[in-house]
């Protein structure tokens, strides 16, 4: 079948790029022809001259990249951001089959729909109302073709009553629904009376060997721990991590921190390599937890320090399913090895269940097309 993935297109987010790749590879392994729709819901929130020029050049074009390279000569921060974006765009170009067109909220003609047999919505936080990009496009309401959601996430534990009808309309248009978190299951069940399947994030459907195939091969001279925080890291938490590193004779590498300029430039392929080579991981990120598990690393999860609704449900669901709830920093026994023989058995069971949902849903769609 010809399948279109509808997800968030974030060319600066590791988890987003890697889940997109993983879902594509999984669908292709089932014999499908897969493309990801470039779904640009809102224009860049840049202002002034830079925004106007980028609008004229077009989204994600090489001209836009050259424009950003020009601005990068004026500051080290812009230079680092430019290098980082190049790495993300190169990864996308080499590994993700994207449409040569884009759609947004103003699009009125969807001619490509004629060539699509089925849409798969997800994964990632495609249904998070707090994101400025969120719209009807995230339910593919523009098409009457069959729709499946795979590991779609709301990103939050509940939604405002004022949005209930908006979600009901969107969810009722999806033929087969699966979500990534238990909280998402409760939201869907409450809104439309359907109990969706809770499935694994696509990144966990691929094996360690699968990921190593697209990883960089850089070798590091010193043993290191990887620190990857999306929220602010407290003084106490970082002090704890420093003590852990010192007691084990490890150096610290910090991702997503401009204090480590080398790692700030890292793209998704470098991200994979760093997790494969790290001795331990300290994080508040869902996908950092996922890749720690994939590569069987010692890890500790910290509460994310940021303003806004809690996003812990996705981590809670994953850790609960794999009997790893003691990996929260506040609960874990420090330096105690993780029994990955047990964890991987549970992961394989969840993987079989998740793949079964996807295969069965696709088979039903294919039968309906051939009837």
Predicted stretch roles:
Residues 1-371:
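Active-site anion-handling motifs in enzyme catalytic cores
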């Amino acid at each position: 079948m010809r399948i279109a993935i509808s997800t968030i297109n974030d060319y600066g987010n590791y988890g987003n790029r890697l889940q997109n790749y993983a879902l594509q590879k999984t669908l292709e392994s089932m014999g499908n022809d897969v493309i990801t729709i470039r779904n640009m819901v809102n224009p860049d929130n840049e202002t002034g001259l830079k925004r106007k020029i980028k609008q004229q050049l077009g989204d994600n074009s090489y001209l836009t990249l050259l424009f950003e390279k020009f601005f990068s000569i004026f500051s080290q921060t812009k230079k680092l951001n430019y290098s980082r974006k190049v790495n993300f765009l190169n990864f996308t170009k080499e590994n993700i089959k994207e449409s040569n067109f884009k759609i947004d909220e103003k699009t009125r003609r969807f001619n490509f729909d004629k060539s699509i047999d089925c849409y798969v919505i997800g994964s990632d936080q495609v249904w998070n109302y707090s994101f400025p990009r969120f719209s009807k496009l995230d339910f593919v309401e523009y098409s009457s073709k069959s729709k499946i959601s795979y590991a779609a996430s709301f990103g939050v534990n509940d939604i405002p009553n004022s949005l209930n009808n908006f979600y009901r309309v969107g969810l009722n248009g999806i033929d087969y629904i699966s979500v990534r978190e238990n909280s998402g299951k409760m939201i869907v069940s409450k809104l439309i009376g359907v109990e969706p399947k809770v499935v694994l994030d696509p990144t966990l459907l691929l094996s360690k060997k699968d990921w190593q195939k697209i990883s960089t091969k850089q070798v590091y001279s010193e043993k290191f721990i990887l620190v990857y925080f999306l929220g602010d890291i407290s003084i106490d938490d970082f002090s704890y991590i420093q003590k852990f590193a010192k007691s084990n004779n490890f150096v610290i590498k910090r991702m997503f921190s401009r204090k480590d300029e080398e790692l700030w430039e890292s793209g998704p392929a470098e991200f994979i390599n760093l997790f494969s080579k790290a001795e331990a991981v300290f994080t508040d990120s869902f996908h950092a937890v996922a890749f720690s598990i994939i590569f069987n690393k010692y890890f500790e999860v910290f509460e994310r320090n940021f303003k806004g609704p809690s996003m812990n449900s996705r981590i809670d669901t994953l850790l609960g399913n794999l009997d790893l709830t003691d990996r929260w920093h506040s609960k874990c026994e420090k330096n105690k090895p993780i029994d990955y023989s047990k964890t991987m058995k549970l992961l394989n069971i969840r993987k079989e269940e998740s793949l079964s949902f996807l295969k069965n849903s696709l088979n039903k769609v294919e039968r309906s097309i051939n009837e």
